[in-house]
Amino acid sequence: MSTVFPPEASSDKMNNIFDSHAHYDSEAFDEDRDSLVASLPDKGICGVINCASDIATSHTSLELAQKYPFIYAACGVHPHEAQEAAGNWLDELKLLCRNDKCVAIGEIGLDYHYDFSPREQQKEFFGRQLALAKELDLPVVVHDREAHEDTLELLRR
């Protein structure tokens, strides 16, 4: 079954909010995630893209997207997590991104503020994920913090 994206908005103006960047997979929502997410349409939310930060949260984002028809997933490895990614992460990401409920690759990019992962590694991961997005014809959700020139350079390639 093919996913309709974006969802059709209601004629009621209160139901036309599309949250393009959320993290409902965060442990901050563990206590009441289901009740909170289930209540979103009643609060005027017609759609949500839940952005992942690593392979594990890519799986979780897709689980949320499968459970709720108005949630979609962006799967990817955030620059903070590049150092922690291991093995065949790109192959696994590619499989996840082929899911009908995955509508983007993200949250990906560069973060030179904290440097939780070495900058060269961040650039490598960002470049590989941009190439995957091109291969799969998916848009990207970009994280850019204090790395504007390098981010633009990689996006222009």
Each language-model region and where it sits:
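Mid-domain alpha/beta scaffold segments of enzyme catalytic cores
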Residues: 2-157
